[in-house]
Design a protein with these regions (language model features):
Chain A
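Activity-critical C-terminal alpha-helical subdomain
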Residues: 417-472
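FAD-binding subdomain of flavoenzyme oxidoreductases
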Residues: 93-97, 103-246, 463-472
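C-terminal substrate-recognition/cap domain of FAD-linked oxidoreductases
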Residues: 18-26, 207-208, 214, 219-391, ...
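Conserved, mostly hydrophobic/aromatic
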Residues: 57, 194, 440
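N-terminal flexible segment immediately upstream of the FAD-binding catalytic core
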Residues: 1-55, 72-102, 131, 248-259, ...
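Alpha-helix capping/hinge segments and adjacent helical runs
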Residues: 12-13, 400-412, 436-437, 441-448
Length: 472, 370
């Protein structure tokens, strides 16, 4: 008996993939330079089937990786060549929508945007909005604690998930809820990148759509001036739904790709979106425009319609893909710095460009200090890829040096596990490992992700006997 | 002072009791390192420890099965770092929320948590969270927490999260420790996201017959920061909604029109954010709950999180609530199961085993002996 026999007993033939050509479809997620062909792919349709696969993995000592839509940017869904890839794409039912409770219950394969689409006509929406929201799955959002441009005001996935049904790495189906008295296991599970189990049912909070939404595009001569405007807006006590910034190189790329029509010669553009009750939005918009003018903005455009708003966002949302127009290859970085250090860190990135002869386009969620530097390189030029990799890593060092983080929303995955010891001590990582061992003592759930070196769980230590120390 | 550690230790007395259990000693560490030294010594001696802050909720949840050392964090009351431009603050866990509010107000900022007891500390607010009205808008303590420094039962100092508002590196131990009642270790330092103090505030209050009357407010686009109900055992039920921001007055007036009545005030009603009396129970219910005779309920219609007093038989009330509602006896004497169903309890037990295998950290304060 092998794990294959067991899987073939659980699933009909069309939902177990062993054909090498078809397996290669799943060899990477959105981070394409890490690839591995899974040993086998299964397509469960129910939590019971997920539990059965996971139990089979436990029985045969085989690792497993869960995958939603495969849009992740840190290799969190990178398969194991010795493991089972559990793809949730067939679990895409919206199980219930209850507007009195302002809740929806959905399966993990449902796309982020599908939740909003299901309730939009009634005036509700699901707040977290990662750029990939048209295709990314809510199960993946839970694993990665996904953010998005609007998380500045509304928070991340973890602030919007109220309960989960999970399959633990032992194959048990367990519910964890914010209503459970005791440890916030829900908060620990969201963002654990698939290392604590697989979410099979997700209860999300629905929010009433704001009465008014307005979007402002402000152009600046320099990125420093744009940064000053951001600080002043936040300092004035205004909390916009989103504050996004792009530098000249990112603007150039977006223009080439989607003709977004941002003001020519801008050294930086800010996109500020305000939402809420109409009187608040109107007074805040006037204040934000005044701040932008005072900090040197030479042009401001306010979207007068939903179409104009979409046009302003188009340049920003296409920015990652757009750099493909101005560079043969690029690395998308994801670091965070305290907002007050933005200027210093951008100067540091500038210095790195000069030192290594590598161009960096900057796109960022300026309101919360989340940088997405796009490190551009020519993969056919000898040594350039390596230099780009060094620059990318040095940017993370800058973030850590300024008290920030190595990832704001893309996750650690396989990509940044090696950077974890730069941000955390061994004691910190060992303590996190205790959580891992509580959920997954066998280390079968998405092994090799998040943590730099595999740690064995061992037995729960036995009670020590000793004498009181010298304090007591 | 004992030994070379210089940590202040005194004998425990009845005033130091946790749910009636009197500790043998009280330790008063003044730094993170001293917390670690004390816990290391307790590990050597096999001593049971319960952390305490403002002691406002020590009577909540179950008493510890055993208690040798009350670890009093009230001497750790410093603001370690406050960068106003980042809207972030890092504090020692023993600082009171009132003191922190004073410091932050000087910069026109606040930690947007409504804490029901004066004297409650940050550590206690995390370890034993209490619901506050504005959780609807700003979230609970766990939602505003960015980073944490904890000390484990063996004295290990560990950090998680950070001091930026957006960060997904590593497990969020801060959230795990939220609601832990001292059973996983000691929360020694915490970092929070702050908010600017609102330019203006208005409360709309109105008396009502049923709980559903307030639904129109939640379906509106007026964005109240809180919608609270005060349902006394006898007398009229009152609903109050808070509006914040420069246009608070306009929105409160608009809300009055939506409801067809009510009064707008510049101050909160006297019962706002205050728990009803003992015996005290926590009720979570997302639809209008059945409320038994003689029971008073206060809390958020918007989040479905309430505190209730006057209930004697928890099981009887539970049987009248929806299946996904939760009723837990917090403080006082109850008949019936204090905890009710907690589907994730087996997982909590496994976490407890990994963090505190010797069961020395506040053993038995939570359900199932956790």
């Amino acid at each position: 008996m092998t794990v294959f026999d067991r899987l073939e007993a659980i699933f009909p033939p069309d939902r177990v993939i062993t054909d090498p050509v078809r397996l290669r479809t799943y060899e990477c997620d959105g981070l394409t330079y890490h690839r591995a062909t899974p040993m086998v792919v299964v397509l469960p349709e129910t939590a019971a089937e997920v539990a059965a696969v996971v139990k089979a993995c436990a029985e045969f000592g085989v690792p497993f990786v869960a995958r939603g839509s495969g849009t992740g940017l840190s290799g969190g869904a990178l398969p194991r060549s010795d493991g089972v890839l559990i793809v949730t794409s067939r679990m895409r039912r919206i199980l219930s929508v209850d507007l009195d409770r302002r809740q929806a219950v959905v399966e993990p394969g449902v796309t982020n945007l599908a939740i909003t689409e299901a309730v939009r006509d009634q005036g509700y929406y699901y707040a977290p909005d990662p750029s990939s929201q048209q295709i990314c799955s809510i199960g993946g959002n839970v694993a990665e604690n996904s953010g998005g441009a609007h998380c500045l005001k509304y928070g991340f996935t973890v602030n919007h998930v109220q309960a989960l049904e999970i399959v633990t790495p032992d194959g048990e189906i367990v519910e964890i809820s914010e209503d459970d008295f005791g440890y916030d296991l829900l908060g620990a599970f969201v963002g654990s990148e698939g290392t604590l189990g697989i979410a099979t049912k997700i209860t999300v909070r629905l929010m009433r759509a704001p009465e008014a939404v307005t979007t402002l595009l402000a152009a600046f001569e320099t990125i420093e001036a744009g940064g000053q405007a951001v600080s002043s807006i936040v300092g004035a006590g205004i909390l916009p739904a989103a504050i996004e910034m792009m530098d000249a190189l990112a603007i150039e790329a977006a223009e080439a790709a989607v003709s977004c029509g941002y003001p020519a010669d801008a050294g930086a553009v800010l996109i500020v979106e305000l939402d809420g009750p109409t009187p608040d939005v109107e007074s805040q918009l006037a204040e934000v425009i005044a701040i932008c003018v005072a900090t040197g903005s030479f042009e401001q455009r306010v979207a007068a319609s939903a179409e104009e708003r979409a046009k302003i966002w188009k340049g920003r949302k296409s920015a990652f893909a757009a750099v493909g127009r101005i560079s043969p290859a690029y690395i998308v970085q994801d670091g965070v710095v305290p907002r007050t250090c933005l200027g210093e860190v951008l100067a540091g990135i500038d210095a790195l460009q000069t030192e290594f002869g590598i161009r960096v386009a900057n796109v960022f969620h300026a309101g919360d200090g989340n940088l997405h530097p796009l490190v551009l390189f020519d993969d056919t030029a000898p040594g350039e890829g390596e230099r780009a990799e060094v620059v990318s890593g040095r940017i993370l060092d800058l973030c850590i040096l300024h008290g920030g983080s190595i990832t704001g929303e893309h996750g650690v995955g396989v990509d940044k596990a090696r950077y974890m010891p730069r941000m955390f001590t061994d004691a910190d990582l060992d303590t996190m490992q205790r959580v891992r061992c509580a959920f997954d003592p066998g280390g079968r759930s998405n092994p090799g992700k998040v943590f730099p070196t595999p740690r064995l769980c061992g037995e729960v230590p036995r009670v020590r006997k000793g004498s009181p120390g010298e304090i007591f | 002072m004992l030994g070379h550690t210089r940590v202040t230790v005194r004998d425990g007395g009845p005033a130091d009791a946790v749910g009636g259990v009197v500790p043998r000693w009280v330790a008063l560490p003044e730094s993170l390192e001293e917390v670690s030294v004390v816990l290391g010594a307790c590990a050597d001696g096999g001593l049971a420890v319960t952390p305490a802050g403002g002691r406002t909720k020590l009577c909540w949840a179950a008493p510890p099965e055993r208690l040798d050392v009350l670890l009093d964090l009230s001497a750790m009351h410093e603001v370690l770092e406050h960068v106003a431009g980042d809207l972030v603050v890092r504090v020692q866990a023993g600082i009171t929320t009132a003191r922190l509010a004073e410091v932050l107000a000087k910069s026109g900022q606040e930690l947007a948590l409504d804490v029901p007891f004066p004297g409650a500390t940050i550590g206690g607010t995390l370890a034993a969270p209490s619901p506050g009205p504005r959780a609807y808008r700003y979230g609970n303590a766990r939602d505003l927490l960015l980073g944490v420094t904890v000390v484990l039962a063996d004295g290990t100092i560990a950090r998680a999260g950070g001091k930026v508002v957006k960060n997904v590196a590593g497990y969020d131990l801060g959230k795990l420790f939220t609601g832990s009642y001292g059973t996983l270790g000691v929360i020694a330092e915490a970092t929070f996201r702050l908010h600017p103090l609102p330019a203006d505030r208005r409360w709309l209050t109105f008396g009502c017959e049923g709980w559903e009357d307030a639904g129109a407010l939640l379906r509106s686009q007026l964005e109240p920061s809180a919608v609270e109900i005060d349902h006394p055992a006898e007398g009229l039920t009152t609903v109050a909604a808070l509006f914040e921001g420069s246009a608070a007055g306009d929105r409160a007036e608009a809300a009055r029109e939506v409801l067809g009545g009510g009064e707008v005030h510049a101050d909160a009603p006297s019962w706002w954010g205050r728990p009803p009396g003992l015996p005290l129970a926590s009720l979570r219910c997302r639809v209008a709950p059945h409320v038994p005779e003689g029971v008073s309920v206060r809390g958020s219609l918007a989040t479905g999180v309430y505190l209730a007093s006057g209930v004697t038989d928890l099981d009887a009330w539970r049987s009248r609530l929806p299946a996904d509602a939760r009723l837990v006896g917090l403080a006082g004497d109850f008949t019936g199961d204090r905890w009710g169903p907690i589907p994730s309890l087996p997982l909590m037990r496994r976490v407890k085993e990994r963090f505190d295998p010797e069961r020395r950290m506040s053993p038995g304060r939570l359900a199932g002996g956790v």
